[in-house]
Amino acid sequence: MSNLDSLVLEPIEQPLSNTPNMLSNEDRVLCNMTPLQRLYSIDEDTYEELVCVWAYSCLGNKGYTEVYRVGQAGDKGRDVLAYYDRVKGAFDLYQCKQYKSALTYSDLCGEMGKLLIYTFNNTYPIPQNYYILCPKDVSQSFVDLLSNNGKNLKIKLKNYWETVINKKVGPNWVALNEEL
């Protein structure tokens, strides 16, 4: 049994035009909100649902065969899984962050730690792509960490592994070593 089999997964079906959480163009005009304001106003669960629908309906050209929303307590850093081939374990991982301000390194270091630990322990395979979706953008200091092909981010992750990241990951922490 794979680790994915132990999760309760509901496949995302093709969205209907009369989905209750979607506003018609007329409703959008009447409520006087721009699309971005509407995106900012939804809660984190609705945001994850939106990403699932988006992955299903808009990214079909990427070759996804199945899309699942996992986001819940104990999701091991997996909010949305979009599979190219579930049998082979080929998938993209979408990490959704709906915060009131720009995403910072502190907001995300625990999630990156989970990705490293759970892929290292073969709890789930390394995703083809790891996407971080956050409507409020990312902080400039986080953008700076991503420069240099992520070398600055790797250095910070190494420096904060024992003192910060393992605490955020919880009981599944591992010591940082050359293999990891």
Predicted feature descriptions by range:
Residues 1-76, 81-180:
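Mixed-charge (Asp/Glu-Lys/Arg
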